[in-house]
Amino acid sequence: MAGVCDRVPNFLSPSEDQALGPALGSAVALNCTAWVFSRPQCPQPSVQWLKDGLALGNGSHFSLHQDFWVSDNFSEIVSSVLVFNLTKAEDYGTFTCSAWNVSSHSFTLWRAGPAGHVAAVLASLLVLVVLLLVALLYVKCRLNVLLWYQDTYGEVEMNDGKLYDAYVSYSDRPEDRKFVNFILKPQLERRRGYKLFLEDRDLLPRAEPSADLLVNLSRCRRLIVVLSDAFLRRPWCSQSFREGLCRLLELTRRPIFITFEGQRREPIHPALRLLRQHRHLVTLLLWKPGSVTPSSDFWKELQLALPRKVQYRPVEGDPQTRLQDDKDPMLIVRGRAAQGRAMESELDPDPEGDLGVRGPVFGEPPTPLHESKVSIGEGHASEMDVSDLGSRNYSARTDFYCLVSEDDV
């Protein structure tokens, strides 16, 4: 019977040796459960704990809880739980549980180092780099993206009865005239295709100042005010600028004010302070020494504040010259002879203009037919050079045309 009682237990937990790395100061519970073969004549099964080869028992530092469950077929399950706190480095080691001193499994506790924050630090740095790149792209490409959106999906302000894109108001000082005529106007009109109304150029004759201002503003889609030092020295800028600003907001849509970098010094002009307080109602732009570059942010912000420009593709050919085989009817010489009349009917199928082809007149002899075509150089010599007619652009002349006679030549 002794051989029956010496059968090797089967460990259910742990199924194999384990290595654990709990942190210092944590509580540890090691569970050792085994299935043993038992007979009435066999001794009571038990589980023994050892630490680094030394036996452990219940004490102030270690606590043991042992349970038994009897099953069929003369088998029994025994479980022992070792509970303790890792308070010092000596508490780490190899803990072995054995059943009947026949079979054993072990728990190896090793001290885990400080929590690894490398992955968290790398992830944080990656997120920070991504945010910096997004912020950099926003700063560098924000205006370009807004311009693309305006040119693609922006509101087209056409057929509104306006003749100009912007009304430019500035003082009559020489430096302001130079800024408007040599910097602002060339950049907006020539490079970007806007049409400006300058205060000293297209004024209505013999008009009252107040009525003239109302008429001019009604003809323009935007208002640009060059707030130079000379402009700010005007009496109304210091005394009644608030009333004037309220009036402008009623007359025009979101006026544009151009300020200069030298005006940022203290004390700030009351008009500039008022404009900064109402940024949500006006467009306030700052001119810097580097703004003269065509690709600077100043021009992009100004273009965003101005109406969207629509580019039209030029029409190829003039409807009035398509019937003439792309020949300019203004250069066709009309003759007086019969041959000239025949030449006229051949070169111009519509000699009476837009009224249609003239039919035969009652009583008029029919026009003789000629076997050979008469060229211009045979009957009536012309000194005009018509070799470049095919390369001319007729898109600008779409309203009317006239025929040039030989006498006019």
UniProtKB/Swiss-Prot annotation:
Domain Ig-like C2-type, residue spans: 9-109
Transmembrane segments: 119-139
Single GO BP term: negative regulation of cytokine-mediated signaling pathway
Record InterPro entries: Ig-like_dom, Ig-like_dom_sf, Ig-like_fold, IL-1_rcpt_fam, TIR_dom, Toll_tir_struct_dom_sf
GO CC aspect terms: cell surface; membrane; plasma membrane
Phosphoserine modification, residue list: S382
SMART domains: TIR
Cell location: Membrane
Keyword terms of this UniProt record: Disulfide bond, Glycoprotein, Immunoglobulin domain, Membrane, Phosphoprotein, Signal-anchor, Transmembrane, Transmembrane helix
Disulfide bonds: C32-C97
Cytoplasmic domain ranges by topology: 140-409
Residues modified by glycosylation: N31, N58, N73, N85, N101
The protein's assembly and partners: Interacts with IL1R1, IRAK1, TLR4, TLR5, TLR9 and TRAF6. Upon IL-1 stimulation found in a complex at least composed of IL1R1, SIGIRR, MYD88, IRAK1 and TRAF6. Upon stimulation with LPC found in a complex at least composed of TLR4, SIG1IR, MYD88, IRAK1 and TRAF6. Interacts with PALM3.
PANTHER family per UniProt: INTERLEUKIN-1 RECEPTOR FAMILY MEMBER, SINGLE IG IL-1-RELATED RECEPTOR
Family: Belongs to the interleukin-1 receptor family.
Name the record gives this protein: Single Ig IL-1-related receptor
Species in which this protein is naturally found: Rattus norvegicus
Organismal lineage: Eukaryota, Metazoa, Chordata, Craniata, Vertebrata
